[in-house]
């Protein structure tokens, strides 16, 4: 539960960084969590 809460909060702030990095794991994680 805490992880979900943190992810949602970070997703907004890291959404830009994650998209830029778009690592293989991150890309899959985002695609599977979007």
Curated annotation (Swiss-Prot):
GO terms for biological process: artery development; calcium ion import; cell redox homeostasis; diaphragm contraction; endoplasmic reticulum unfolded protein response; ER overload response; gene expression; intrinsic apoptotic signaling pathway in response to endoplasmic reticulum stress. The keyword Cytoplasm applies. It is found in: Nucleus; Cytoplasm. Its main location: nucleus. Signal peptide: none annotated. Keywords: Cytoplasm, Nucleus. GO terms for cellular component: late endosome; nucleus. One of its GO terms (molecular function) is DNA binding. The keyword Cytoplasm applies. Interacts with DDIT3 (isoform 1). This is DDIT3 upstream open reading frame protein. It comes from Mus musculus (Mouse). The lineage of its organism: Eukaryota, Metazoa, Chordata, Craniata, Vertebrata. The gene is Ddit3.
